[in-house]
């Protein structure tokens, strides 16, 4: 985990073991062991000098050996290129060297162009061909399970009718998820001098951003309501002031 704006060069150093195991890893462990996810993605940044996609401690020792993950590990897009591209991590000099580092650490699949050099790396003795075959097997198993090689009429994913799009059940579920994801803080002893029936202050850069409500890897909803819009619609008699307060990726605070 690191700052969004410099994730391609960021190096997380001296992370306390307790913080790693109690703060960062529990969610991933639960997804692997309880949720049985089929695929895990390694991120851009470095941890103690090693990019996540060439970090055997996390990909092999923790993810596979300790947690028992059997699925596919893929890189974030362009992450392996960051190993050797000028001005980035600088852990490799060439795409071939970067590819060898990633494959040997346990990254099965790359989103990018570096893995085109796998044959060259194998011929140079930088990668054992057995590792390539192992990764290929994991990739093919995942695609077989998805039905990529089957006829459309035999694949359940192609049989989903269009009328489920934006259906009531899905909208109700989305609303429930949104409601349960909200954390409410009480204004005890009028710490903030606000009368909830007269004046409401909505703060935060995401309060008036419909894209961030769903994330940047999602479909397009038929309609959406931002937090700010929802509060204004509900509290029509109150003065609702919006203060972005800060930005998501820049180290600055806006005037309120």
Predicted ranges, named:
Residues 1-256:
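Glycoside hydrolase catalytic-domain context in secreted enzymes
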């Amino acid at each position: 985990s690191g700052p969004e704006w410099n994730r391609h060069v960021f190096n997380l150093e001296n992370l306390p073991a307790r913080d790693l195991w109690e703060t960062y890893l529990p969610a991933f462990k639960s997804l692997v062991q309880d949720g049985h996810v089929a695929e895990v993605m390694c991120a851009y940044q470095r941890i103690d000098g090693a990019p996540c996609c060439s970090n055997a401690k996390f990909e092999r020792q923790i993810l596979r050996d300790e947690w028992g993950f059997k699925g596919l590990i893929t890189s974030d897009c362009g992450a392996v290129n960051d190993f050797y591209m000028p001005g980035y991590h600088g852990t490799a000099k060439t795409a071939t060297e970067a590819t060898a580092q990633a494959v040997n650490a346990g990254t099965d699949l790359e989103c990018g162009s570096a893995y085109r050099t796998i044959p060259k790396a194998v011929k140079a003795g930088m990668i054992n061909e057995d590792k390539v075959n192992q990764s290929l097997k994991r990739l093919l198993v995942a695609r077989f399970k998805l039905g990529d090689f089957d006829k459309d009429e035999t694949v359940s994913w192609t049989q989903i009718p269009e009328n489920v799009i934006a259906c009531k059940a899905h909208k109700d579920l989305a609303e429930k998820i949104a409601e349960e994801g909200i954390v409410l803080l009480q204004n005890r002893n009028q710490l903030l001098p606000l009368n909830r029936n007269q004046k409401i202050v909505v703060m935060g850069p995401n309060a008036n951003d419909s894209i961030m409500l769903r994330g940047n890897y999602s479909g397009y909803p038929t309609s959406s309501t931002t937090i700010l819009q929802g509060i204004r619609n509900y509290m029509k008699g109150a003065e609702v002031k919006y203060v972005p307060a800060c930005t998501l990726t820049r180290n600055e605070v806006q005037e309120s």
